[in-house]
């Protein structure tokens, strides 16, 4: 699908200069490593820079799915957040990769007023230092235990991915309406 979209963009005369991908979707579905590698290869062939938005996937991918770490992929930039699986905050994003690109992005961040304040740096170091892949595995195992309890109570309304369980908004609304007799 991505290759078709890339081909269509090039056929339309568009210059594809950047390709961004997300390893772990907001829905908590993981992109398979083979798909990531295929996208990277196609993007490289097109001469595009590659950014991986790895907010939650930076830790879930390696710890749960035995995928490479973000920068072990052939990408130019990787980003993640410290408020996701296995880290303890603060709530901010990290950017790593090609030093020149990171410097350019950081300068733009300063211009826009969205850079991390230096007073947060010690908390960033602490969060990264305490990180262990086992913590992610433990969090996922606990989530699966909670999912079993939820399924016993809510049945097939519980939706599961390999790393999370959830009740969808429409199911919560339906249950509330049932309880209200509506």
Mark where each language-model region is.
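Conserved C-terminal alpha-helix-loop-beta "cap" of PLP-dependent enzymes
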Residues: 158-182
């Amino acid at each position: 699908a991505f290759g078709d979209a890339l081909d269509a963009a090039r056929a339309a005369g568009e210059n594809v200069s950047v390709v961004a991908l997300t390893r772990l979707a907001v829905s908590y579905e993981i992109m398979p490593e083979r798909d990531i590698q295929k996208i990277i290869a196609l993007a490289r062939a097109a001469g595009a820079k590659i950014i991986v938005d790895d907010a939650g996937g930076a830790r879930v991918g390696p710890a749960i799915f035995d995928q490479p770490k973000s920068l072990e992929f052939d990408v130019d930039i990787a980003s993640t957040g410290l408020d996701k699986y296995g880290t303890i905050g603060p709530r901010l994003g990290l950017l790593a990769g090609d030093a020149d690109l990171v410097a350019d992005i950081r300068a733009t961040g300063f211009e826009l007023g969205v850079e991390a304040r230096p007073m947060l740096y010690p908390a960033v170091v602490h969060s990264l230092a305490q990180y262990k892949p086992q913590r992610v595995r433990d969090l996922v195992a606990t989530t699966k235990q909670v999912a079993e309890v939820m399924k016993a109570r809510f049945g097939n309304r519980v939706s599961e991915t390999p790393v999370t369980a959830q009740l969808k908004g429409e199911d919560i609304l339906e249950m509330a309406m049932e309880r209200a007799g509506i």
